[in-house]
A protein has these predicted regions:
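Short, structured coil/loop segments at alpha-helix boundaries
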Residues: 12, 109-110, 266
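Conserved beta-sheet core of the metallophosphoesterase superfamily
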Residues: 132, 158-177, 182-281
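Long, contiguous juxta-domain segments that are non-catalytic but functionally important
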Residues: 1-28, 64
Length: 281
């Protein structure tokens, strides 16, 4: 036990802190940029000739992330706050068994879980650094997905330790599966989408959100099904996002498109701008 504690202590002592990032000089105090990243499936292996889509592995996903993030950030305004929502299924697998934890569906993986987790943390660190260069403060939330019910926690805790000395970054460690944030008269929500239909999500939020009645502009993100859809449900604007990842062998049986985007919200008027990159190579 003492040897294990010693190894853990050495690992945390070697965890480098986030380096300082220059504060942007001119930001809009009434704006909040939201980057919803759903279904990244980091560590997935896909062969385009088999799937009818593009190839996918860790190296290609890294290039896609760097290129896509740069494109949407170039369009979005500099804002008081940015929110990076990792909306579940950040990693394709949860362990080295290469199966979905609940249904035991076999997964095509590109690497062992140690490398997948390490490289996933590194690319999210890159994303946080880029977002912080343009926005005054950044909030990070890592949500559970059906592919990563445990590994998402390791990534969240790693990001919290990395940003501990950075006052402009907050890692939201709320253990609930629902993300909720108020921005003036605007409310933003997120949930992976595998355990609740959109109508039920709207009813649930109206019941439990403490600032629901204060915000006439309400927006919710989900993912999971890898197919874009949007609907006005009661007082909620619900959107199921297109995935970051392309199709794998299983997903090739239906049509989906990839995308990465930033939504800009005004604290009084709700969503005012959307920047989308289709992640085409």
């Amino acid at each position: 036990a003492e040897e294990s504690l010693s190894r853990m202590r050495e690992a945390f002592e070697g965890l480098l802190e986030m380096p300082p990032v220059d504060t942007p000089s001119d930001v809009a105090a009434d704006l909040c940029n939201v980057i919803p990243l759903f279904d990244v499936h980091w560590g997935m292996a896909a062969w385009g000739e088999e799937t009818g889509d593009v190839d996918y592995n860790i190296e290609l996903a890294r290039d896609d992330m760097m290129r896509g993030l740069g494109r949407v950030l170039s369009v979005a305004p500099a804002a008081q706050r940015a929110v990076l929502i990792l909306g579940g299924d950040l990693t394709h697998a949860d362990d080295n068994n290469a199966q979905t934890p609940k249904s035991k569906h076999p997964l095509d993986v590109a690497a062992r879980m140690h490398r997948v987790t390490d490289s996933a943390i590194e690319i999210i660190k890159f994303a946080v650094h880029r977002v912080l260069e343009k926005n005054l403060e950044v909030v990070i939330r890592v949500l559970r997905g059906n592919h990563d019910p445990n590994s998402h926690r390791a990534i969240a805790f790693a990001l919290r330790e990395w940003t501990r000395s950075q006052p402009r970054v907050t890692v939201d460690m709320d253990p609930r599966e629902m993300f909720m944030m108020q921005w003036g008269r605007t409310a933003m929500f997120a949930q992976h989408g595998d355990r609740m239909k959109a109508v039920d999500l709207s009813l649930k939020l109206a019941d439990v959100c403490p600032f629901w009645s204060e915000c006439p502009h309400r927006y919710a993100y989900t993912g999971h099904l890898h197919r874009m859809s949007a609907e006005r449900i009661g007082g909620l604007n619900w959107e199921r996002l297109e995935p970051f990842a392309p199709s794998d062998d299983y997903g090739a049986t239906w049509v989906n498109r990839r995308a990465m985007k930033i939504d800009t919200y005004h604290n009084q008027r709700g969503r005012i701008l959307t920047a989308i990159d289709p992640l085409e190579r």
